[in-house]
């Protein structure tokens, strides 16, 4: 992550902003999660790893002079998004099967939507949006 933030800063205009959104796991679960496997890491995002908010901010501090202007956790709203995605997916099940996908594909993605929705509803997962800038950015708040 350090390299990521270093690259972002090097590409950012002096008075620019950088916005990112990421799914997160609580810091107290991060180390165990990183060393283990689960449904998502096995079937949906192989090789993926959810960061914690602390890991993101630590990497930012270590590799750049960026600062945080705003943080918002929209995870609870993401629950609704996933439920609607699932409903839309299932409403189009016949079309998906007609494309050549099988029932296992349908079950895998239905499980993914419900599994993730439960994580957001229980606040086991977060979905953060963070606005970064540089110290002294006089354009912040001026409508860019």
Feature annotation, model-predicted:
Residues 1-2, 132:
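Internal amphipathic alpha-helical segments of the cytochrome P450 catalytic fold
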Residues 2-19:
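A short glycine-rich, Lys/Arg-flanked "PGG" loop and its adjoining helix->strand segment in the class I
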Residues 24-140, 144:
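Substrate-binding/catalytic lobe of Class I Rossmann-like enzymes that use SAM or dcSAM, i.e.
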């Amino acid at each position: 992550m350090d390299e990521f933030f270093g690259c972002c800063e090097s590409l950012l205009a002096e008075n620019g902003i950088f916005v990112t959104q990421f799914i997160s796991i609580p810091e107290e679960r991060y180390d165990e999660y990183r060393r283990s496997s689960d449904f998502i890491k096995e079937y949906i995002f192989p090789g993926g790893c959810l960061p914690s908010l602390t890991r993101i901010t630590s990497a930012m501090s270590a590799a750049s002079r960026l600062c945080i202007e705003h943080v918002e956790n929209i995870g609870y709203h993401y629950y609704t998004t996933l439920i609607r995605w699932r409903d839309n997916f299932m409403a189009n099940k016949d079309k998906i099967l007609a494309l050549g996908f099988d029932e296992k594909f349908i079950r895998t993605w239905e499980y993914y939507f419900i599994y993730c929705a439960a994580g957001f509803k229980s606040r086991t997962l977060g979905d953060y949006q963070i606005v970064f800038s540089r110290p002294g950015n006089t354009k912040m708040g001026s409508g860019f």
